[in-house]
Each structure stands twice: as C-alpha cells, then as structure tokens.
UniProtKB/Swiss-Prot annotation:
Gene name, Swiss-Prot/TrEMBL: metK
Subcellular location field: Cytoplasm
Protein name: S-adenosylmethionine synthase
Superkingdom classification of source: Bacteria
Role: Catalyzes the formation of S-adenosylmethionine (AdoMet) from methionine and ATP. The overall synthetic reaction is composed of two sequential steps, AdoMet formation and the subsequent tripolyphosphate hydrolysis which occurs prior to release of AdoMet from the enzyme.
Stored Pfam families: S-AdoMet_synt_C (PF02773), S-AdoMet_synt_M (PF02772), S-AdoMet_synt_N (PF00438)
Subunit-level organization: Homotetramer; dimer of dimers.
Length: 389
C-alpha cells in the first residue's frame, strides 16, 4: 500500500517572531478599543534588550504604546534578565507614521474612484478546510499548535518549572495515498528553551511523557514513531536574545502549515481594512462552511483584490475531487451567501473589535474561542439546502 509524508510546524508564544506578532496585535487591539475605524499597520522588531515599534497608524485613540509593548512581553514570560530579554528593562522605541492619504482615499467609503470601501491593497488570499480534525484543520498544523499550547501551559502552571518561553514543534505525518487519510505519526520534533540546570535525559523524558503523549492521538503513535527532542542537546539561550524577531515572519505557522497555498500577506498588526488579514479570514470562513455543510471533505478558495476596488477581482475554488457539486456551482453559492467586499467582510465577521491578540500565537485558524468569528459554521445549513443536499 503506497503512502506519503507531510510535515507542518508551530512555534510557541515565546518565539521571537511570535513575540513581535503579539506586540503588534496588542497595539492594534488597544487602538481598536478606543477607535474602531482606525487604520493600523503596526510592525515590531525585538532583539536583545530592544523592542522597536514602527509602521503607519491613523487614529484618534490615545495609547501608551510603550506600556502595551512591555505588558505583552511580560505576559509572554520574558520578565527577567536571566532569560536574555526583560519586559521592564528592554529599550522600546516608537516610530509610527500616519497612513498615506493616497492609500486612504481608496479605502475610505465615499472617496476615490470606487465609492464603496475599497480594498486596502492588491493581493491574493487563500482559505482552506478539511475533515482531518474536529476544527476542520489539517492534522499536522492542528496538533503542532496543541503541542506548543501544552508547553506553555506546563511552563506557566509551574509543573515543569525549568521550561522557558521559546519553543518549536514539528510533526511529520504518514498518509495513505489511496484514501488520503492519516495512518500514523512518523516523527515528532520538539525543541524547548530550558533552564541551564536541567539534564538532557530528564528533559527529554518529561517532554515526551508530559507534553507529547497527552496531546497526540495514542493510536497514531507507533513503535516506528521517532522523537527528536532538543536535537542540538542544549537550548538555554532563546527568544529575542537568540534570534531577532519580526512581525509577519510566521505566515505558514499562522495559517495551514503548508497544506494550502499562501498569498504572502501577513496578519498581525493590521486592521481589517487590510484584505491581507480580513479576506484571508473570510476565505477560511467560506471553506470551513463548505466542508461543514458536507459539500466537500476538502476545500480551498482563492480570492484576489485591487487596491481601492470593493469587489474581488477573482474567486476560485478547488475541492480536490471531493465535491458533491461542481466547483462552478460552489462559486455561485459563495457569491450568494458571503459578501466578500471589504466592508461586507468586516460586518459579516464583526471585525472592528479588539479581538486580535489571541490570534497572534498558536494559529489564526482552527480556534474555538468566541473571538474567532471566522471559525463559525453558521452558514453550513443554508449552503447545504441551497445545494439541494
């Protein structure tokens, strides 16, 4: 029987790029709490002893950006110089400009050539869903995120007090080529930052028994499964001290772990007038409802936009041979049941709220918290009825 391998990875909230993402989204949320119509493109850089805030912000909100950055870094767990990065001691620089008026006139409703609220930029976005997990996410990315959440829980609860904030997980999964179903887990890679005193064997055993095995389905862990735990043997220096972190550098971790294409636009720090974020969320919403409706077991949607223009320049769908109706019919249903203009997306998903901080770690999709409105399947019944199933 033929089979193939597929791999996805996740990183913890203490990974330097994720620190940057979380600072950017915390600043976005602080602004939206006061000014829901603000235009925000907040970028963050973190390095040893340094946090730089830059980008374009147009708002009436009064926000202490330095305080928000420090509080976010502290919440993640970088609160001591022993960790190489200290929320209270690092230097924080603020270098925000305002949004270009040339861009603003294309986005502001009633201005520019298209009087509707136009897209904030050109670009292409993808959404994806499949039936491999309860949240209709691909297996490898879903469980990679769960491993990282487990690492964080054990660190913060003090059950494994030698854990430090920075960590990464990677799963290689074996699929059956004929059915396309997951057969077993081939390799688990988990690297976690740790205190210098902990011995390697104690660390390895604790990671396998207390992080990995409680999370991964036991029936998919076999005698052939390989465990690669801190493969270099030591991971004391980590976080922004180990590597410079930047907003928007973990776009595959943020989405589908490579199981679906990515249009290239990052999410964190961007208000929902930026279709890089809002349209990608809408695409996930569409794809998930199609799968939840039983119209396909796998669904990928692409949309594209032109700056200043409200209507998408294209919509395409691929169900990889699993569709119960044609892809042309699915596109018609999508146009009938989902408003994919920027203003329509914002209203449909209620995006002008301070809801983004949670999304900046452990994935933007496959989440069940109430803030993640794009994970609802409230359109599934209507889609199924309209399809005649």
């Amino acid at each position: 029987m033929s089979e193939y391998l597929f791999t996805s990875e996740s990183v913890s909230e203490g990974h330097p790029d994720k620190v940057a993402d979380q600072v950017s989204d915390a600043i976005l949320d602080a602004i939206l709490a006061q000014d829901p119509k603000a235009r925000v493109a907040a970028e963050t850089l973190v390095n040893t002893g340094l946090c730089v805030l830059a980008g374009e912000i147009t708002t009436t909100a009064q926000v202490d950006y330095i305080k928000v950055a420090r509080e976010t870094i502290k919440r993640i767990g970088y609160n001591s110089s022993e960790l190489g990065f200290d929320a209270n001691g690092c230097a924080v620089g603020v270098y925000y400009d305002q949004q270009s008026p040339d861009i603003a006139q294309g986005v502001n409703e009633g201005e520019g050539i298209d009087l509707n609220q136009g897209a904030g930029d050109q670009g292409l976005m993808f959404g994806y869903a499949c039936d491999e997990t309860p949240t209709l996410m691909p297996f490898a990315i879903y469980y990679s995120h769960r491993l990282m959440q487990r690492q964080s829980e054990l660190r913060k609860d003090g059950l494994l007090p030698w854990l430090r904030p920075d960590a990464k997980a990677q799963l290689t999964v074996v699929y059956d080529s004929e059915s396309g179903k997951v057969k077993r887990i081939d390799t688990v890679v988990l690297s976690t930052q740790h205190d210098p005193e902990i011995g390697y064997e104690e660390l390895k055993n604790a990671v396998i028994e207390q992080i990995i095995k409680p999370v991964l389905p036991s029936e998919l862990l076999t005698d052939e499964t390989k465990y690669l735990i801190n493969p270099t043997g030591r991971f004391v220096i980590g976080g922004p001290q180990g590597d410079c972190g930047l907003t928007g550098r973990k776009i595959i971790v943020d989405t589908y772990g490579g199981a679906a294409p990515h249009g290239g636009g990052a999410f964190s720090g961007k208000d929902p007038s930026k279709v890089d974020r809002s349209a990608a969320y809408a695409c996930r919403y569409v794809a998930k409802n199609i799968v939840a409706a039983g119209l396909a077991t796998q669904c990928q949607i692409q949309v594209s936009y032109a700056i200043g223009v409200a209507e998408p320049t294209s919509i395409s769908i691929d169900t990889f041979g699993t569709g119960k109706i044609s892809e042309e019919k699915l596109i018609t249903l999508v146009r009938e049941h989902f408003d994919l203009r920027p203003k329509g997306i914002v209203q449909m998903l209620d995006l002008l709220r301070p809801i983004y901080s949670k999304s900046a770690a452990y994935g933007h999709f496959g989440r069940e918290e109430p803030e993640f409105t794009w994970e609802r399947t409230d359109k599934a019944a209507a889609l199924r009825a309209a399809a005649g199933l």
